[in-house]
């Protein structure tokens, strides 16, 4: 199949592989001692209060938008790898499974003491203590949804939607994917003060 004919959507095997990788991540997180659900004992589909012990503990929150964008970006990267450069060593049906592997690896790292401590020390994390396994699994699901959306939608629609999500969360909670990465890698005190309402 030529590059123009490459399909980045998973077939049944690719979908099962993606699910299997996600399940493995859940098992690893449970083995790390992460709480299965919010320690509060309540499961909510949405929790919109950032300054709360339930943030990053429920199915979705303001940061779910960032995980959708992860999916957009991973699809874009897969598009470059398979369509432009060719990647004959690996069938494109595994692109989603590879994206889940990358996202899942981040979820494991994000819930490790070194990253939790980093968030608490350099970002406006309001006592961040890691995610519940439910939240991490949902984050992976949102990434997969973003990937599959980008695989079907026109590039311009995906780009506009991604920028819209970033601007919306910036307005709503003074945080987004770009600022999250900036503050984690290269913290800027002025940004931290602004995020705190200063």
UniProtKB/Swiss-Prot annotation:
Highest taxon, organism lineage: Bacteria
Coiled coil: none
A Pfam family the protein falls into: DUF2585
Key word Transferase present: no
Topology in the lipid bilayer: Multi-pass membrane protein
Keyword flag ATP-binding: no
Localization annotation: Cell membrane
Keywords: Cell membrane, Membrane, Transmembrane, Transmembrane helix
Family: Belongs to the UPF0314 family.
Protein name: UPF0314 protein Saro_1818
Organism: Novosphingobium aromaticivorans (strain ATCC 700278 / DSM 12444 / CCUG 56034 / CIP 105152 / NBRC 16084 / F199)
């Amino acid at each position: 199949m030529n590059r123009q004919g490459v399909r980045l959507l998973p077939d049944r095997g690719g979908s099962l592989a993606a699910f299997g990788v996600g399940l493995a991540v859940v098992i690893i997180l449970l083995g790390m001692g992460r709480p299965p659900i919010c320690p509060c004992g309540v499961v909510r589909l949405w929790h919109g209060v950032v300054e709360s012990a339930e943030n990053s503990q429920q199915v979705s929150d303001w940061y779910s938008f960032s995980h959708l964008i992860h999916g957009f970006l991973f699809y874009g990267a897969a598009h470059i790898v398979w369509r432009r450069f060719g990647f004959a060593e690996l069938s494109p049906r595994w692109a989603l499974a590879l994206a889940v592997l990358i996202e899942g690896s981040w979820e494991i790292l994000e819930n490790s003491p070194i990253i939790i401590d980093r968030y608490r020390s350099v970002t406006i994390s309001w006592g961040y203590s890691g995610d519940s396994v439910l939240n991490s699994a949902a984050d992976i699901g949102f990434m997969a949804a973003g990937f599959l959306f980008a695989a079907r939608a026109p590039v311009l629609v995906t780009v506009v939607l991604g920028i819209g999500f970033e601007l919306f969360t910036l307005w709503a909670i003074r945080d987004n994917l770009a600022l999250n990465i900036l503050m984690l890698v290269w913290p800027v005190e002025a940004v931290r003060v602004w995020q705190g309402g200063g």
